[in-house]
C-alpha cells in the first residue's frame, strides 16, 4: 500500500453533492470560478470521506517483539492503531533498542506518530526489505538508520484517495517538516515530495546516505532475520522457503515441512537472515542428494548432463557457482539452469522421477532437524575446472560406468569446515 493518506471531514452538503451522480447535479449552473473551485473542494472532501466510510479497510501492520526483547518488528500497512500498539509494546519492554520496519506505506498520521515514538525511545531503525511512503516518516526518526543490502526506501508526494480510485494532491507540509526535523537534506526532501503520488522514487543507498536518510548499509548477518515479520506461522514459513528455493516444490512434502520448521524455529530464536539462508540451502541440498542417491542410472546420467549445462550457464567467471555445481550442489545447479539464457530441461522433472524411484527415505543427521547450517570448503578454480572436465569425460563412457562415475563426482559428501553457530 504505497500511499500517504490523510483524513478530512467534509460537510454534509459535500457528501450529498458527491453522492448525487458524482456531484454533477451540484455543478449545474455553477458559473463563477470561485463557485467551481468551492464545489470541486467539496467533492474532493466528500469522495475521500466516502472512501474512508465504505472502501474495504486495509489490514493494519503486525506488531511483535523479537527474541530477547531487543527488536520490535512492524510489518504491513501503517493503519489506525499501529503506533498505539507499538507504544504499548515499548512500555512493557523498555529493553527494546531497535525496530524493524517492513511497510509499503499507510496513514501519514501513523507514520508521524510511530516516528515520534522511535525518537522518544532512542530506537535504531532497520529496513531489511522495503519501507515506502508513510513508513519513511518513521524510519528517518531512528537514532541510527540501517538499510539492508536488499532494502529499499520509497518516496512520493502525499495524497488522499477517493471512493472511485481518484487521487487528490494535498499539502505536503507535515512530511516536509518531518524530514527536516530528522536532518534530511532539503534538496533530497524537495525531490522526494515532487514525485507524483501514483509513482515511487527509490534512491540508491549512496544517495540515501549522502542525504542523511540512512546511516549505514548492513549485510543480512548483522541483525535477526525479518523475513517472517508479517506472519511467522507454519504456512508462511513454508511459502517463504519455496520462494527462496522453488526447487523444493518437487521435494518430499514431509522433508519440506521439516525444513520450514527449522527455518521458523530459527526466526523465533533470533537467527540471522544470512545463517537462515545458508541453512535452508544446506538442508535442501541434503534432501535432494538423498533422493538422487537412490535414483536409477538413467536419472543419474541426466543429472550429470544438467550439471554440465549449469556450468556452461554460469561460465568460468563465477568461481563460487562453478565450485558449487562441480561439488554436486543441486540447488546451485537448479539456479543456474533457471537463469540460463537458453534454458535446458530443468531439474524439477528429474526430482519427480527420483522420488518415484525412492521409498520415502529415512534421512540421516545431515538432513535432519538438528543439523546445523554449514559452509563447504572453497575449492580453487583449477580444481573446479578439473572436476567439470572429469564429469564431461564420465558422461562419454558406457551408460552403467557413466552413472557410477557421476555418482562419485556429484553425490558424495563435500568437505566441510566449521559449523555456523545456530541459536
What are these regions (language model features)?
Residues 119-162:
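Glycine-rich beta-to-alpha active-site loop
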Residues 156-236:
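Charged, glycine-interspersed solvent-exposed loop segments at helix/strand-loop junctions
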Residues 67-71, 229-325:
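N-terminal Sec/ER secretory leader and immediately downstream segment
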Residues 33, 44-85:
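STAS-typified acidic loop motif
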Residues 312-378:
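Extended amphipathic alpha-helical interaction segments
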Residues 16-25:
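Bacterial N-terminal signal peptides
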Residues 94-110, 124-131:
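Short, glycine-/small-residue-enriched flexible loop/hinge segments at domain edges that mediate gating
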Residues 252, 375-423:
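A cross-kingdom marker for long, charged
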Amino acid at each position: 500500500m504505497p500511499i500517504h493518506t490523510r483524513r478530512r471531514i467534509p460537510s454534509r452538503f459535500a457528501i450529498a453533492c458527491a453522492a448525487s451522480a458524482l456531484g454533477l447535479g451540484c455543478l449545474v449552473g455553477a458559473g463563477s470560478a470561485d463557485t467551481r473551485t468551492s464545489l470541486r473542494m467539496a467533492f474532493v472532501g466528500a469522495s475521500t470521506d466516502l472512501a474512508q466510510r465504505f472502501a474495504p479497510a486495509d489490514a493494519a501492520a503486525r506488531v511483535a517483539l523479537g527474541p530477547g526483547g531487543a527488536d520490535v518488528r512492524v510489518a504491513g500497512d501503517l493503519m489506525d492503531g499501529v503506533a498505539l500498539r507499538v507504544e504499548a509494546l515499548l512500555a512493557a519492554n523498555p529493553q527494546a533498542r531497535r525496530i524493524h520496519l517492513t511497510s509499503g506505506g499507510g496513514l501519514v498520521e501513523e507514520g508521524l506518530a510511530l516516528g515520534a515514538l522511535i525518537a522518544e525511545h532512542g530506537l535504531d531503525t532497520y529496513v531489511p526489505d522495503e519501507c515506502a511512503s508513510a513508513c519513511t516518516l518513521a524510519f528517518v526518526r531512528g537514532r541510527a538508520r540501517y538499510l539492508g543490502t536488499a532494502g529499499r526506501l520509497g518516496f512520493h508526494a502525499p495524497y488522499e484517495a477517493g471512493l472511485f480510485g481518484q487521487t487528490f494532491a494535498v499539502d505536503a507540509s507535515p512530511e516536509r517538516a518531518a524530514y527536516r526535523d530528522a536532518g534530511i537534506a532539503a534538496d533530497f526532501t524537495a525531490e522526494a515530495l515532487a514525485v507524483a503520488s501514483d509513482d515511487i522514487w527509490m534512491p540508491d543507498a549512496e544517495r540515501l546516505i549522502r542525504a542523511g536518510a540512512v546511516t549505514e548499509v548492513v549485510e543480512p548477518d548483522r541483525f535477526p532475520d525479518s523475513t517472517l515479520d508479517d506472519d511467522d506461522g507454519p504456512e508462511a514459513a513454508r511459502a517463504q522457503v519455496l520462494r527462496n528455493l522453488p526447487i523444493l516444490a518437487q521435494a518430499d512434502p514431509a522433508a519440506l515441512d521439516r525444513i520450514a520448521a527449522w527455518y521458523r524455529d530459527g526466526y523465533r530464536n533470533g537467527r540471522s537472515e544470512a545463517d537462515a539462508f545458508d541453512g535452508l540451502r544446506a538442508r535442501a541440498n541434503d534432501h535432494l542428494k538423498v533422493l538422487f542417491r537412490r535414483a536409477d542410472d538413467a536419472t543419474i546420467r541426466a543429472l550429470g548432463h544438467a550439471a554440465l549445462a549449469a556450468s556452461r550457464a554460469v561460465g568460468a567467471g563465477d568461481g563460487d557457482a562453478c565450485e558449487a555445481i562441480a561439488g554436486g550442489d543441486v540447488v546451485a545447479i537448479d539456479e543456474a539452469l533457471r537463469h540460463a539464457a537458453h534454458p535446458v530441461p530443468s531439474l524439477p522433472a528429474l526430482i519427480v522421477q527420483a522420488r518415484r524411484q525412492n521409498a520415502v527415505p529415512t534421512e540421516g543427521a545431515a538432513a535432519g532437524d538438528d543439523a546445523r547450517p554449514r559452509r563447504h570448503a572453497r575449492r580453487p578454480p583449477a580444481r573446479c575446472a578439473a572436476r567439470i572436465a572429469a564429469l564431461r569425460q564420465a558422461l562419454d563412457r558406457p551408460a552403467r560406468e557413466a552413472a557410477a562415475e557421476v555418482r562419485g563426482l556429484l553425490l558424495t559428501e563435500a568437505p566441510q569446515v566449521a559449523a555456523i553457530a545456530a541459536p
